């Protein structure tokens, strides 16, 4: 029995179509994984300096004699806006035993008290070009205590 001339070609075309879609799916998955990895690297590289700027700004604007330092990063994310990176973060800040104008507040112990006024939960939005050490505070909202 004679087969149709395109019958073998059709099965090859179908095979190529199926394999082609698998290759595209693998490429899309790899691209997504790479993008997630790049996003993680940017956060790991630039978030610490941005958090430091946020805490420094909080201390500069605070009327309290005592310095506050980072207790925990509660949440953070990054957005790209034109040529700037914008970090949004929710931080738990604790009052230390050191004055805010002392040299090494990073090593100051937290004040030990059950009073809520020893901590602040703050939401910061900071526009930055961290590779140029440029930071700009866009928003700061703080509430006393842990929320």
Curated annotation (Swiss-Prot):
Signal peptide residues are 1-28
**What is this protein's tissue specificity according to the annotation?**
Specifically expressed in testis.
- Major place of localization? secreted
Highest taxon, organism lineage: Eukaryota
Give yes or no: UniProt keyword Signal: yes
Isomerase as a keyword of this entry, yes or no, is no
GO annotation terms (biological process): antimicrobial humoral response
- Residues annotated as glycosylated are 117, 139
State the name under which the record lists this protein: Cystatin-9-like
What is the protein's species of origin? Homo sapiens (Human)
Q: What is the lineage of its organism?
A: Eukaryota, Metazoa, Chordata, Craniata, Vertebrata
């Amino acid at each position: 029995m004679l087969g149709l001339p395109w019958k073998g070609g059709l099965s090859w075309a179908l095979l190529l179509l199926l394999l082609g879609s698998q290759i595209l799916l693998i490429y899309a998955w790899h691209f997504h994984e790479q993008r997630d990895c790049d996003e993680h690297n940017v956060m790991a590289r630039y978030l610490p300096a941005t958090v430091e700027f946020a805490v420094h700004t909080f201390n500069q604007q605070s009327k309290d004699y005592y310095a506050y330092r980072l207790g925990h990063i509660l949440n953070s994310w990054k957005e790209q806006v034109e040529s700037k990176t914008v970090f949004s973060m929710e931080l738990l800040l604790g009052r230390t035993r050191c004055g805010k104008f002392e040299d090494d507040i990073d090593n100051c112990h937290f004040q030990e008290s059950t009073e809520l006024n020893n901590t602040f939960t703050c939401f910061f939005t900071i526009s930055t070009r961290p590779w140029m050490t440029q930071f700009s505070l866009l928003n700061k909202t703080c509430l006393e205590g842990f929320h």
